[in-house]
Curated annotation (Swiss-Prot):
Principal location class: membrane
Residues covered by the IQ domain: 114-143
Residue ranges with Basic and acidic residues bias: 62-98
Membrane topology: Peripheral membrane protein
GO BP annotations, alphabetical order: binding of sperm to zona pellucida; epithelial cilium movement involved in extracellular fluid movement; single fertilization; spermatogenesis
UniProt function note: Sperm surface zona pellucida binding protein. Helps to bind spermatozoa to the zona pellucida with high affinity. Might function in binding zona pellucida and carbohydrates.
Name used for this protein in its record: Sperm surface protein Sp17
Keywords: Membrane
One term of GO molecular function: calmodulin binding
Highest taxon listed in the record's lineage: Eukaryota
CDD domains reported in the protein's UniProt record: DD_CABYR_SP17, IQCD
Ranges where the record places region Disordered: 56-115, 127-151
Assembly with partners or alone: Homodimer. May interact with ROPN1.
């Protein structure tokens, strides 16, 4: 029973979403007739695997999910290292030279990637147009056959 306009949010246990995703994937893959019985057998097999290998996929999935959503690696900035000003100037000028070379190299690579992508897009579009024309021809021939049958 739900309460209209309620702001109640239930907390799903860690790893439960991963278990349901795995079950859903297997149901879609196997297409069973009796889904509740299939789910029971699936969870039984997961329990047996967990007991034999001491590996819990739900626990592992919750750790991965936690690491993904709670990644604090980019929140704090490292303080800059202090060194001689002369060394910093030489490092900066060296970096500028290196980046300009890499920019040219990457632009050539980008152009090649863009060309390949353009060819793929054009081929897909041409295929789409050809399929549309084939559909039109097929519907026209079906309509002509129906007209001939009606005569």
């Amino acid at each position: 029973m739900s309460i209209p306009f309620s702001n109640t949010h239930y907390r799903i246990p860690q790893g439960f979403g991963n278990l349901l995703e795995g079950l859903t994937r297997e149901i879609l893959r196997e297409q069973p007739d009796n889904i509740p019985a299939f789910a029971a057998a699936y969870f039984e097999s997961l329990l047996e695997k967990r007991e034999k290998t001491n590996f819990d996929p739900a626990e592992w999935g919750s750790k991965v999910e936690d690491r993904f959503y709670n990644n604090h690696a980019f929140e704090e900035q490292e303080p800059p290292e202090k060194s001689d000003p002369k060394q910093e100037e030489s490092q900066i000028s060296g970096k500028e030279e290196e980046t300009s070379v890499t920019i040219l190299d990457s632009s050539e690579e980008d152009k090649e990637k863009e060309e390949v992508a353009a060819v793929k897009i054009q081929a897909a579009f041409r295929g789409h147009i050809a399929r549309e024309e084939a559909k039109k021809m097929k519907t026209n021939s079906l309509q002509n056959e129906e007209k001939e049958e009606n005569k």
